[in-house]
Regions:
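Helix-coil boundary/capping segments in enzymes
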Residues: 1-182
């Protein structure tokens, strides 16, 4: 039986290096992802995947989103690099991957619309956004062109939760027990 796991995270090492250079204040997030072997070392990840015949993934890039550490002038380039890198991984390993979920520079609406079209042309299966844009509601009217582009190019939107270690999933917890934000 074939199973497809949608929205499983990975961190392309080249993308992480570029982002850490751009945003040293967020380096801890990239280092954390790089220290999870199956998230950043594709040989290690593929070894795990080999153990599950018929299982494939449609991966996306793990947090943090580019809009949290790059302004609207730099985030488009970083989102494009991330999408290029994840596409390379998927194309190099078709036995494990059915496609990828693309990231967009949500803090630059015009560039997001352009990246959505490019993602469609690249074969992306969907677009990843986060539950808020640096504290702002994602249903704000200025973001509607992003949703219209996803509709136009028939790309589903997958919404990634945003929080952090100190933001619990449940009211009676003091911190995130399951790290759903990561």
């Amino acid at each position: 039986m074939k199973s497809i796991d949608v929205f499983c995270h990975l961190m392309p090492p080249e993308y992480a290096k570029i982002c850490m250079a751009e945003a040293p204040n967020k380096s801890h997030m990239f280092v954390r992802a790089l220290n999870v072997a199956s998230m950043s070392n594709m040989d290690a990840r593929n070894e795990v995947l080999k153990a599950f015949p018929g299982y494939k993934q449609i991966p996306n890039i793990v947090s943090p989103p580019v809009e949290t550490f790059a302004g609207p002038d730099k985030s488009p380039r970083l989102a494009a690099i991330g999408n290029d890198e994840i596409k390379k991984i998927v194309e190099a390993n078709p036995e494990f991957y059915e496609g990828f979920i693309a990231g967009i520079p949500f803090n630059n609406v015009k560039a997001s619309v352009e990246e959505i079209k490019r993602a469609k042309d690249m074969g992306a299966k969907g677009i990843q956004i986060y539950t808020h844009m640096n504290g702002e509601a994602i249903d704000t009217e200025k973001y509607w062109p992003i949703y219209e582009a996803c509709e136009k190019y028939d790309l589903p939107i997958l919404i990634h939760p945003v929080g952090g270690q100190m933001v619990p999933e449940f009211p009676k917890e003091n911190r995130s027990k399951y790290e759903l934000w990561f």
